[in-house]
Curated annotation (Swiss-Prot):
Record-given protein name: Ceramide synthase 2
Membrane topology: Multi-pass membrane protein
Organism: Mus musculus (Mouse)
Regulation: Ceramide synthase activity is inhibited by sphingosine-1-phosphate.
Complex formation: Interacts with ATP6V0C, ASGR1, ASGR2 and SLC22A1/OCT1. Interacts with ELOV1, HSD17B12 and TECR. Interacts with NDUFS2. Interacts with PAQR4; the interaction regulates the stability and activity of CERS2 and is inhibited in presence of ceramides.
Membrane side Lumenal: residue ranges: 1-40
Ranges per topology, Cytoplasmic: 325-380
Amino acid sequence: MLQTLYDYFWWERLWLPVNLTWADLEDKDGRVYAKASDLYITLPLALLFLVIRYFFELYVATPLAALLNVKEKTRLRAPPNATLEHFYQTSGKQPKQVEVDLLSRQSGLSGRQVERWFRRRRNQDRPSLLKKFREASWRFTYYLIAFVAGMAVTVDKPWFYDLRKVWEGYPIQSIIPSQYWYYMIELSFYWSLLFSIASDVKRKDFKEQIIHHVATIILLCFSWFANYVRAGTLIMALHDASDYLLESAKMFNYAGWKNTCNNLFIVFAIVFIITRLVIMPFWILHCTMIYPLELYPAFFGYYFFNFMMAVLQMLHIFWAYFILRMAHKFITGKLIEDERSDREETESSEGEETAAGAGAKSRLLANGHPILNNNHPKND
């Protein structure tokens, strides 16, 4: 049965146009073609990325944070309380008023003390400013290098300027070492993002992040299997064009450089809209949906690839909505902070802030300006 499933999975009609077989893509006459076995290396490379990231954050990002004067906020810790901790872990982090009253009776604390405990406990679980800065530094470094590498791999190719050449001779298109390594490194990086997502800074579009990472990995794997390598390299280079701008804006945001952060955000928003909402649908998607049909009848691989492209495009539209809304409020002077951000909760509104707490709050508010996230925009 397993052999039957294996044979069906690799059935040529799922992956290749009619009248073509895997034998047509065997290496010969010095020409090398993409193979599924090539991707085995991406998993150990993903683990290597995690190791490199650890040392980068420790020996590069942390000293850089100190140089830019990235300061932590002093957080008041919730005192140990077994009753409240059990509820926090099992029932929820934000109890309703009726639950606050019940917990007050069970713990012997006043309702106000219970609410204060949960605020402090939630703040304990929020990532520190240094953690956010180190994560943004790592992603900025990778995305900048990846964008430069992507341009180097694609800009001298004829299909960079004439998208019809993406399909010229398809699928009998050999690959060169630069394309191979560009694919392996990009796929390895996205594997590493998926592996570390549970420990990374969790934002409110966490589910969209997972969908994006999974869709990207599937697209990269499928495009390699089916030898959509020319289209794949263009898509990766286009995606990396805006990500490093976003991560650099976040770094300056955490460092308190408001003007630099805001200016970089505006540049990021412009580049994101141009690349994801203009070039992607009207050039790249047109290239992958229309041009292949001029050469071959539609086949499963054609539909599957373009379906996954449509999933990515929907995520682009989702994120662009928030970017444009933020940009509008930013321009009109109404934006105080990112509406979707996971804000630190303060106690000053209820008159509970001590002198030390007030000092900490003033440091927090100095960091209250807009920023989005990553390979796909998210919020801090």
